[in-house]
Amino acid sequence: MDLRRRPPKPPVTNNNNSNGSFRSYQPRTSDDDHRRRATTIAPPPKASDALPLPLYLTNAVFFTLFFSVAYYLLHRWRDKIRYNTPLHVVTITELGAIIALIASFIYLLGFFGIDFVQSFISRASGDAWDLADTIDDDDHRLVTCSPPTPIVSVAKLPNPEPIVTESLPEEDEEIVKSVIDGVIPSYSLESRLGDCKRAASIRREALQRVTGRSIEGLPLDGFDYESILGQCCEMPVGYIQIPVGIAGPLLLDGYEYSVPMATTEGCLVASTNRGCKAMFISGGATSTVLKDGMTRAPVVRFASARRASELKFFLENPENFDTLAVVFNRSSRFARLQSVKCTIAGKNAYVRFCCSTGDAMGMNMVSKGVQNVLEYLTDDFPDMDVIGISGNFCSDKKPAAVNWIEGRGKSVVCEAVIRGEIVNKVLKTSVAALVELNMLKNLAGSAVAGSLGGFNAHASNIVSAVFIATGQDPAQNVESSQCITMMEAINDGKDIHISVTMPSIEVGTVGGGTQLASQSACLNLLGVKGASTESPGMNARRLATIVAGAVLAGELSLMSAIAAGQLVRSHMKYNRSSRDISGATTTTTTTT
């Protein structure tokens, strides 16, 4: 039996249950068994039943007729050619043979289709399905001498909530129906209507009707959909609300910053704020940008490894760098090629270009420059086959040793000295406990785990929160959170020196999500909104140092909480849902 074509069973009801909340399964009685066994179901008709003779005899007759008539006609054809008799002159016998050949051919052609399609054209009746159910029940019934199986009550799932939809104008209703029917592609609504808000509303309504699921809790109003058209998000149906908290003031390089953090994790902002307080009282933190360069690494292939090596020698030759830089820098007035590094894997070459990108994060900028260089290289290397503009030697949105060692984006180190009395009063721990915990957890523990750039407590928490608040690419949190946290007792063990080194902070203050109203406001709060008018790239570098400073504060506070044994207590107080989940679950499973 083909289970794919089997209709669903009707729902089981229990007349003994007045409220309908439960249904019971009980073994059938013996009288039911006798009645079921006495039931007979007529087999469904088949297409082959219409033949006057049994199928095997009919097949034998037509197979014999087809080949014998074909042999006879071929024999007559040869005789006519031999005696120069026109082929169109036929006798009655030959005419009958031709008709028999055509008839047998038609039958044989139809025969091979009958057996193939008759299982599809003959559908089993509802009684047949009942018979199959009867057989299945008999097969699964176990004959035992033990007492009957107790009744098992199965709770019904609650009915889904009805979809709450807004009433739309008649014209919009027609468009919604066209989207559902596939007449109008959903992605083309903005260009067809010329109104991004209206397009999102129509797409949202079509989505609810197609899926049968309500998205009433996803807000639609209060967002500028024009600002994301063609650059931030396609086919929008609403926007997500994430709370933004402020940690600070963060005293960094002599300036005070109020750091916006978009997060749904309790304790995160409070903990970072405590770290900022300890650093502020101790005189603040200082930061240094070690390197500023975005990378892109295409992969190219040659016929031999020797030829790929020739490209490597050409690109890494200092005499050729100026020419490559001129070609590369055409992509933007802010793009400045810094270095070219090439590595070989067989006959494949991976070329890592690094360039400064001003206040932009710079992925598009460096990709354009790489494209210019690849087109230029085809003159000297016509046999070069460009496989991809990115060969993962960049490496973007993936944990990679090349970023940990060489850096990508902004490489920043941030440090602070926290006085011993501040450690005791504000952080509720001791210098010795912090130093020991950092060595065993962040250094030795991460090494035991085989961590790549994860020699820290929770750098990604702070990086992600600041990234979302300021319009950065959240996916680049992967490499941007690579961090090593160092702690050392100084001044005869009275104070502690803490630092974070982050080689791959990928941020920008122009382009992408930084132009959105909420994210732009957070950048303005930090004083790094838009491009720097003083020096290209200054705002982006300052944002990177703020990220590192916030990470430093977060590391200091969390490590202190762990050393003092406060982590579990604080999270149980501030990072738990206040809802009675067990009660809600019980209500859901016991009510209709």
Swiss-Prot record:
The chain crosses the membrane at residues 47-69, 97-117. Inactivated by phosphorylation at Ser-577 by KIN10 activated form. Probably also phosphorylated at additional sites. Keywords: Endoplasmic reticulum, Glycoprotein, Isoprene biosynthesis, Membrane, NADP, Oxidoreductase, Phosphoprotein, Transmembrane, Transmembrane helix. It catalyses: (R)-mevalonate + 2 NADP(+) + CoA = (3S)-3-hydroxy-3-methylglutaryl-CoA + 2 NADPH + 2 H(+). Found in all tissues. Isoform Short is expressed at low levels specifically in flowers. Expressed in both the tapetum and microspores. It holds the Pfam family HMG-CoA_red. Regulated at the post-translational level in response to alterations of sphingolipid and sterol biosynthetic pathways. Negatively regulated by a PP2A-dependent dephosphorylation occurring at a site different than Ser-577. Completely inhibited by mevinolin (IC(50) = 12.5 nM). Reversibly inactivated by phosphorylation at Ser-577 by spinach or Brassica oleracea HMGR kinases in a cell-free system. Down-regulated by KIN10 through its phosphorylation at Ser-577. Changing residue 577 to A: Abolishes the inactivation of activity by KIN10. Gene3D superfamilies: 3-hydroxy-3-methylglutaryl-coenzyme A Reductase, Chain A, domain 2, HMGR, N-terminal domain, Hydroxymethylglutaryl-CoA reductase, class I/II, NAD/NADP-binding domain. Disulfide bonds: none annotated. Interacts (via N-terminus) with B''ALPHA and B''BETA. This is 3-hydroxy-3-methylglutaryl-coenzyme A reductase 1.
